[in-house]
Amino acid sequence: MASQQEKKQLDERAKKGETVVPGGTGGKSFEAQQHLAEGRSRGGNTRKEQLGSEGYQQMGRKGGSTPDKTDKEDAEDEPSTRT
């Protein structure tokens, strides 16, 4: 855990627009950046749990579906990863 002095220095840097916490981009203070990073991490993990790791990986490879194709047509175009 950061000491009071370190927190104050990090807070000052964050107020100048610097990202001082990985994943805390956009936070206007050290504490705000911590909360943003925690929420982003938790949100990604929750999404992964909902889809399962296989679905999460497929979503990353595939991207969004196109409006001119149905899901079935998209699946037919997708190369099969099963053996």
UniProtKB/Swiss-Prot annotation:
Extent of Basic and acidic residues compositional bias: 1-18, 37-51
Keyword line? Cytoplasm
What coarse category fits the chief subcellular location reported for this protein?
A: cytoplasm
Record region (Disordered): 1-83
Write out the annotated subcellular location. Cytoplasm
Statement: the UniProt record of this protein carries the keyword Cytoplasm: yes
**GO CC terms, sorted:** cytosol
UniProt cross-references to Pfam families, sorted A to Z:
LEA_5
Which GO terms are recorded in the biological process aspect for this UniProt protein? response to abscisic acid
Q: Where is the composition biased (Acidic residues)?
A: 73-83
The protein's induction, as recorded, is: By abscisic acid (ABA).
Q: Which InterPro entries match?
A: LEA_5, Sm_Hydphi_plant_seed_CS, Small_hydrophilic_seed_prot
Q: Is Cytoplasm tagged as a keyword?
A: yes
What function does the entry list?
This protein may play a role in equipping the seed for survival, maintaining a minimal level of hydration in the dry organism and preventing the denaturation of cytoplasmic components, or may play a role during imbibition by controlling water uptake.
Q: Identify its protein family.
A: Belongs to the small hydrophilic plant seed protein family.
Q: What is this protein called?
A: Late seed maturation protein P8B6
Q: Which organism is it from?
A: Raphanus sativus
